[in-house]
């Protein structure tokens, strides 16, 4: 059964409507999962700081909610993911209250605390207070753009999986995911960005819903996400000190993967330029230097990305380091 949010509120001061939404859902006693910086947005309910929760013992998570009828996640990616996971394990409704907009986890059924990611259920409600989100660091909002443009290459990979591996494919989810990305890119390239935080939140929620429709991360996660995970591995392997975010890495990964599709004649050069210019418009990184990695690290990440998950993508059986470097040079990432 497809589960998508019953309530989606995206407006200034939306957070004051949390009690109303709970009442509409006949929920009386939620447990809030939040952080020390975002607890100030929780004025009414019992709470636990997300960094005090041990998530490795999955079966024990349901014990947190034995005295509660629902779970609310308030904050960025981690408190929302942990709240989602606790709600899933305890079979209770989850409400998402994002305080920033850096990835589509605010609305998707996916929990990305570990790799591979974990499938749960989409939030029953999403309450996005744009007054709060506008105040979040610009770097986080730029990362959100990277997560959205990655839908373009993710859907291309999904279509490739359908053709070459006879994978199940949802036309409605694929079209929805691509349209969301194109509409946001069109907005940032043709406006003064005054409404960017609100438009971004809408796009991220739509992206999350496309995942819920497909019951798979396929419409929003492809080879560009594998590249991002490979970069995370490089950080750990070589002790690289960079504060690059998931969405930023996915944005740069999208440029690299789009170059491969361009060479195979499966994407228009205008679309590739649109992706790059959209990232630039919101000051998201488009080069290795802006991400904080040297050229060799990016080449290694791109050449190893295919091995991180059993998922068919344009990377197929992998690129040599030489070919990876060529792709990165042609896309002007290095």
Curated annotation (Swiss-Prot):
Residues reported to bind substrate: 104, 147, 229
Main location: cytoplasm
UniProtKB keywords: Cytoplasm, Lipid biosynthesis, Lipid metabolism, Metal-binding, NAD, NADP, Oxidoreductase, Phospholipid biosynthesis, Phospholipid metabolism, Zinc
Annotated EC: 1.1.1.261
Entry keyword Phosphoprotein: no
Pathway membership: Membrane lipid metabolism; glycerophospholipid metabolism
The record's free-text note on cofactor binding: Binds 1 zinc ion per subunit.
UniProt: NAD(+) binding residues: 77-81, 99-102, 108
Nucleus as UniProt keyword: no
UniProt cofactor(s): Zn(2+)
GO CC terms, sorted: cytoplasm
Localization: Cytoplasm
GO molecular function: glycerol-1-phosphate dehydrogenase (NAD+) activity; glycerol-1-phosphate dehydrogenase (NADP+) activity; metal ion binding
Binding site for Zn(2+): 147, 225, 246
Function: Catalyzes the NAD(P)H-dependent reduction of dihydroxyacetonephosphate (DHAP or glycerone phosphate) to glycerol 1-phosphate (G1P). The G1P thus generated is used as the glycerophosphate backbone of phospholipids in the cellular membranes of Archaea.
Family statement drawn from the similarity comment of this UniProt entry: Belongs to the glycerol-1-phosphate dehydrogenase family.
Listed name of the protein: Glycerol-1-phosphate dehydrogenase [NAD(P)+]
Organism of this sequence: Methanococcus maripaludis (strain C7 / ATCC BAA-1331)
Taxonomic lineage from the root: Archaea, Methanobacteriati, Methanobacteriota, Methanomada group, Methanococci
